[in-house]
UniProtKB/Swiss-Prot annotation:
This is Glucose-1-phosphate adenylyltransferase 1. InterPro entries: ADP-Glc_PPase (IPR011831), ADP_Glu_pyroP_CS (IPR005836), GlgC_bac (IPR023049), GlmU/GlgC-like_hexapep (IPR056818), NTP_transferase_dom (IPR005835), Nucleotide-diphossugar_trans (IPR029044), Trimer_LpxA-like_sf (IPR011004). One of its GO terms (molecular function) is glucose-1-phosphate adenylyltransferase activity. Involved in the biosynthesis of ADP-glucose, a building block required for the elongation reactions to produce glycogen. Catalyzes the reaction between ATP and alpha-D-glucose 1-phosphate (G1P) to produce pyrophosphate and ADP-Glc. The gene is glgC1. The keyword Nucleotidyltransferase applies. Keywords: ATP-binding, Carbohydrate metabolism, Glycogen biosynthesis, Glycogen metabolism, Nucleotide-binding, Nucleotidyltransferase, Transferase. Its EC number is 2.7.7.27. Homotetramer. It comes from Vibrio vulnificus (strain YJ016). Belongs to the bacterial/plant glucose-1-phosphate adenylyltransferase family.
Length: 405
């Protein structure tokens, strides 16, 4: 679809995901063993045959650039590209000051692409969405701007932009992260919230960005400034994400904000459920990513016992000897010695776990070496002296750590 340009906001610092974001940006954080968070946004575009995409980066972007270069390089195909663009301070010596400013500072690239519509999406949520369906809705309504939205429990809605709509789907109210969110009429326990995904008519977007950039009182953010200014005109519409249908998927849509350690851990546990609400296996909606050239995972018994793999994902290049792995995700090249007991844990890859270790509800970042006999997640009071422990008791081992030596 040559008239459509994708702009993916991938500059998030991800401070609430520390220590996983100490050395990488939030969109580059691994997920589900084989993927990075950025992959899910990119797949939503590519599987909808929308292949003119700029990815806007900012903080600690080297890991993200490396991943995209290896896994998402489609340059050379006429009128198709997926190009990362680092923050370049084109409008002055300053970083992006808000989501709208990030797009404004790259106005030149958009104008050169001559789009009719511009799709502006985030890159740090887990979901599948056929963007063409939202685009069709946008065109049908002859909207200047379309915002995708979903129902959210009222208790959680204050973290998002809260929307009011009329019977035709037109936005008639919007408040960014309100302390007292308004509920959906007739549905008092839920609010309608913005997913942070927008489709603009290109000429409207360009004009709004230029006007906003000249406004010294603006925070240069779509949720705080652009949307509240636009919706009273009557040409801003709201796309109901629950109506998005993907062949081979359940009717009930799945969307998770993984902006905290606890949410990130829970989204992984969702993958491991018998009837997982988010599937990695739909052939009609393949999840593309970079797959390193590694041998299959290997499982062997040992003198200390038989290997047991229960309700888990184990990636290529991994080696598990005579250990029990339950409800866990093991990333590439996870090396597990014998007599280990690992449950409800996430190993991001290139992790070595020595003989007789016990891991309970632990996230282990890359390049970690855990000494034989180490127990983590068993005594949280002791763990807190050394590691980050989340509100829900998830222990996080930082990248490159040597534990128990």
């Amino acid at each position: 679809m040559a008239g459509v340009l994708g702009m993916i906001l991938a500059g998030g610092e991800g401070s609430r995901l520390r220590p996983l974001t100490e050395s990488r940006s939030k969109p580059a954080v691994p997920f589900g063993g084989s993927y990075r968070l950025i992959d899910f946004a990119l797949n939503n575009f590519v599987n909808a045959d929308l292949m003119r995409i700029y990815v806007l980066t900012q903080f600690k972007s080297q890991s993200l650039f490396h991943h995209m270069k290896k896994g998402w390089n489609i340059n050379g195909i006429t009128d198709r590209f997926i190009d990362p663009i680092p923050a370049q301070m084109r409008t002055g010596k300053r970083w992006y000051e808000g989501t709208a400013d990030a797009i404004y500072q790259n106005l030149r690239f958009m104008e050169l692409s001559e789009p009719e519509q511009v799709c502006i999406f985030g890159s740090d949520h887990i979901y599948k969405m056929d963007i063409k369906q939202m685009l069709s809705f946008h065109k049908e309504k002859q909207a200047a701007l379309t915002v995708s939205a979903l129902r959210m429990p009222l208790a959680e809605a204050s973290q998002f932009g809260v929307i009011e709509v009329d019977a035709e789907g037109r936005m008639v109210g919007f408040e960014e992260k309100p302390s007292a969110p308004k509920s959906i009429p007739g549905d008092p326990d839920f609010a309608l919230v913005s997913m942070g995904n927008y489709i603009f008519e290109a000429d409207v977007l360009f004009a709004e960005l230029i006007e906003d950039a000249d406004n010294e009182n603006s925070s240069h953010d779509f949720g705080k400034d652009i949307i509240p200014k636009m919706f009273p005109r009557g040409d801003v519409f709201v796309y109901d994400f629950s109506q998005n249908r993907i062949s081979g998927e359940k009717a009930e849509v799945y969307w998770r904000d993984v902006g905290t350690i606890d949410a990130y851990w829970q989204a992984h546990m969702d993958l491991l459920k018998t009837d997982a609400p988010f599937s990695l296996y739909n052939r009609k909606w393949p999840l593309h990513t970079y797959q390193p050239p590694l041998p299959p995972a290997t499982f062997t018994d040992s003198d200390n016992g038989r290997v047991q793999i229960i309700d888990s994902l184990v990636c290529n290049g991994s080696y598990v000897r005579g250990s029990r792995i339950e409800k866990s995700v093991l990333g590439f090249r996870s090396n597990i010695a014998s007599a280990c007991d690992i449950s409800e844990s996430i190993l991001l890859g290139d992790v070595k776990v020595g003989e007789g270790c016990v891991l309970r509800r632990v996230i282990v970042d890359k390049d970690v070496d855990i000494a034989p006999g180490t127990q983590i997640g068993v005594n949280l009071q002791e763990d807190k002296k050394v590691f980050h422990v989340s509100d829900d008791g998830i222990v996080v081992i930082p990248k490159g750590a040597r534990v128990g030596y």
